[in-house]
Amino acid sequence: MARYNHAAVEKKWQEFWEKNPINPKDEKKEKYYCLDMFPYPSGSGLHVGHWRGYVISDAWSRYQVIKGKYVIHPMGWDAFGLPAENYAIKMGIHPSITTKKNVENIKRQLQQINAIYDWDMEVNTTDPKFYKWTQWIFVKMFEKGLAYEKEFPINWCPSCKTGLANEEVVDGKCERCGTAVTKKNLRQWMLKITEYADRLLDDLQELDWPEKVKKMQAEWIGRSYGAEVDFALEGREDKITVFTTRPDTLYGATFLVLAPEHPMVQKICTDAQREKVEAYISMAANKSNVERMAVNDKDKTGEFTGAYAINPLNGEKCAIWISDYVLADHGTGAIMCVPAHDARDFAFAKKFDLPIVQVISKDGKEEVLEEAYTEASGIMINSGEWNGRESSELKVEAANEVEKRGFGRKTVSFKLRDWVFSRQRYWGEPIPIVHCEKCGNVAVPVEELPLKLPEVENYEPTGTGESPLAGITDWVNCTCPKCGSPAKRETNTMPQWAGSSWYFLRYVDNHDDKALVSREKADKYLPVDMYIGGVEHAVLHLLYSRFWTKFLYDIGVVGFKEPFVKLFNQGMILGQNGIKMSKSMGNVVSPDDLVRDYGCDALRLYELFVGPPELDAEWDDRGIDGVYRFLNRFYNLVEESKDKNISPTKEMIRVRHNLIHDIQLRFDSFNLNTVVSGFMEYNNSLLDLAKKEGGVDLETLRSFSVLLAPFAPHIAEECYHLAKGEGSVFAAGWPEYDDKAMEADEIKLPLQVNGKVKAVLEVPKDLSKEEILAKAKECLGDKLDGTLVKEVYIPGKIVNFVVK
């Protein structure tokens, strides 16, 4: 078998497409916007794992082109933020230089994929023409009260030397570098994402997204219905408010636990307990929220404040404790503890010998509890006028009763916290705020944007809580835009998520200097129809971009509320033994050599063939050999058939229509690995027919080439033209199948004797029952020894003879 010259074929058609674009802008066509999550310009470049998502999105984009749509398929660079800056620090080269070099390298590698990216739409988050509009969005949020300044303990990465949002802490560690996160009290800029919590949660049901991602976002937002209950303090006029989802258990609340940072702790702490309490507060301050929440129930710690609250229903005293498993920014920062019906409270009460009062029972009788009774329903006991009631029914009524009696109110609580938006680093968008002693915080006027990031010699993080920008006095010192008095610029920068929260809008209008996107183009080309990328940013980028889109909808910039109609998350490509590919592990597979040895088409196909696209898969270099053999076999089939003028037989037509049906069904279902295996299976069928008939008809070969084109575009274009196709394979239109043409003239029937298959009979499908039974007996011969008791024929399925 001759090997096709992949290098020559790819060069030939890339030059052809350069002169004859397959996806020219055409306003008359229906638009389809297919988008990759744009990459960080990493210094290590792309490996075969990165290729997977880009090949999937390009195959899907080319599919839409063949179906007659104008496809928006852009690419850009998420170049601000920690990944780029940390690499620059490691190399000892300014991030502006390393970023530019890395972009050039990755762009070269992306072009090896030969995806149909529209490079005229290219964006880079570090371009002042781009981040002018990132700053503009921040200013608009500031004007609407959604951006505000606050000093409080935040997640702090000692290695990256910057604050982190809650979403950037994974298992108590920095999601970028893996360092254990601590707490640091800092002045921060916040974005009030909590204002959008209900909408972010409710609108998930409108999205054609993987259920896994929607569930992750729903749990992160964490909406809970319940009541806020006010507990008066013994001997004081103050009160402490708690949030509970189970107001029906209020009679069983025997103690309160406050977050160590709760503002009432210092106020209510007795002199006798103060030293222990303050020591505990200091200890808790060094833990991240994730660490605090991860402690097992039996290992939880705490200190008694010496103060008591009064249960508003029964007047009983409730000791007030502090513990680091209660977080100041969750709910009210205080919880009422019902140890009889909460496993965590039960363990805490047992450890510190606190009272346990059962208020719900399965049968209405009190029992000695060895563990908390946590069933969703039961009969109320020890609950005054609520005794005998069903707890699940009382749950809603209890909230109403709390509100009616004046010591609480029905409310909704969220786990979602406001977004910590500032970073104490250099390589990011400057926050366009001026601090004036007279006017307070003042936004830089929009006509003065972009506020450009100044050049610095020392860009390494300071670790002091101030960014390197704080040391550039000529830049920091300015005049207030409002009153003209001396003022100082904000020196923190935006996080790496800022530009990525809206970049998908800019692609379609990337040269507009009057708007981040014109409303005309937003209405015409947006939102994104298909978004493809990893699941790792489910509660980061994907949540933030939804928030920003809703805000831009509210102020009239866009006419849609959700950025991405459909989302697909590809799995990771792993190295040998299922280990994640990384330079440090030495298991990175570069695509460069594979493209040289096998060609772009073979690598594209193997990226899809390696396994179900939504699942992780282990890379095996040997697998690409099989894909390459398939391409050679198909190429040779076309080469050998092209001049023979083979007339299509019924079987060729049947195979062709089944091929079209099966590939389309698998493609539309995103079963891309089975698409590739389908190509191999049907190619084998055609090779068998070619041996029998001397070749394959050109229409079947052209249809095969069109189906193959989204996946292996170069060889598909070559084979399409060898099969006498006109124009480009991408202008041929997606072939259609005919259900009737898919039916075979003959059927294969398993022949059974006493329920055991003895042979398979191939007969014309229109034979009568009598004819089929006669042929079946003839086929079985002496296998039918004995007395024939019964003949069974299930039409088109099976023949069975019962003999004795």
Model-based region annotation:
Residues 194, 199-222, 259, 263-303, ...:
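Amphipathic alpha-helical
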Residues 1-35, 65-74, 98-105, 209, ...:
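Conserved oxyanion/phosphate-binding beta-strand-loop segments in alpha/beta enzyme cores
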Residues 1-20, 24-31, 259-262, 272-274, ...:
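Basic, alpha-helical terminal appendages of large translation-related enzymes
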Residues 57, 70, 262-363, 368, ...:
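Catalytic alpha/beta core of large soluble enzyme barrels
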Residues 26-93, 99, 122-137, 160, ...:
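N-terminal catalytic cores of NTP/NDP-binding nucleotidyl/phosphoryl-transfer enzymes
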Residues 3, 11-12, 16-20, 90-240, ...:
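Residue patterns forming the tRNA-binding/recognition surfaces of aminoacyl-tRNA synthetases
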Residues 78, 143-158, 223, 410-439, ...:
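Helix-rich, typically C-terminal accessory recognition domains appended to large enzymatic cores
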Residues 307-330, 359, 476-613:
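Alpha-helical recognition segments enriched in aromatics with Gly/Pro capping
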